[in-house]
């Protein structure tokens, strides 16, 4: 049976059929260059699978994502600078406003580093977001993962697998099918897909070429890695 995929905003916490038996593919673009993002988009477009894209910056590739069937745009705000004092923007409100200015259709949010708090959750709701994706419950926890409605009626959507967490070791490879009686949301990053990252050390060793596509592509790992699992998911 073909893999049934859908977008994050389609999840209704009180309607189990909106997520049970489905597979939710998410992508955090993390300031990657256009060629890296396009590489991942081309793979998804060819497969016909649905995906939700958490965007970090304005780029013409966003319009390409919009034009690709079954793709959803979401936001990936970075609040880290507010925590360490290095932010150009002074408040969480300005961080959100900047992103929503170029992707006003966004309904889902996952913060960079999964930064969250009760105040941020309320801000997400206030600006019109409906789905928060800032919780990782890894496969190793062996829990029955489900979405839920928060106190402010924001739908909380945890994910069970993330490529950069897998790269640090200790977690199984990405599930290729929906997990029985479990919300199955997975998270990939285009830079790891492009590099076919097999380990965090390989990724770190290539940092100096992340802005130069020809060289980056030449450093793609030959053998099992993130791209391997990504392509296997898309072939499902």
Predicted regions: what they are:
Residues 91-98:
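Glycine/small-residue-rich loop that forms an oxyanion/phosphate-binding "nest" at active or ligand-binding sites
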Residues 20-29, 75-90:
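Glycine-rich phosphate-binding "P-loop"
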Residues 113-117:
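Gly/Ser/Thr-rich loops at beta-strand to alpha-helix junctions
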């Amino acid at each position: 049976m073909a893999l049934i995929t859908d977008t994050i905003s389609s999840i209704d916490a009180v309607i189990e059929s909106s997520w049970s038996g489905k597979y939710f593919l998410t992508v955090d673009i993390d300031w990657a260059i256009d060629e890296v993002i396009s590489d991942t988009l081309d793979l998804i477009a060819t497969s016909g699978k649905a995906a939700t894209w958490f965007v970090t910056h304005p780029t013409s590739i966003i319009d390409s994502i919009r034009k690709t069937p079954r793709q959803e745009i979401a936001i990936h705000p970075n609040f880290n600078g507010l925590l360490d004092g290095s932010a150009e923007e002074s408040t969480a409100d300005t961080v959100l406003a900047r992103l929503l200015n170029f992707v006003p259709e966004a309904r889902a949010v996952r913060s960079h580093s999964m930064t969250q708090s009760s105040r941020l959750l309320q801000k997400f709701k206030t600006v019109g977001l409906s789905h928060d994706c800032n919780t990782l419950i890894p496969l190793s926890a062996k829990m029955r993962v489900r979405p839920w409605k928060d106190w402010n009626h924001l739908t909380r959507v945890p994910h069970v697998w993330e490529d950069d967490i897998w790269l640090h070791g200790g977690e199984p490879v990405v599930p290729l099918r929906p997990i029985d009686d479990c919300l199955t949301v997975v998270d990939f990053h285009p830079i790891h897909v492009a590099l076919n990252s097999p380990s965090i050390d390989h990724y770190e060793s290539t940092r100096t070429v992340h802005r130069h596509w020809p060289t980056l592509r030449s450093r793609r790992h030959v053998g099992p890695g993130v791209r391997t699992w990504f392509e296997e998911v898309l072939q499902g």
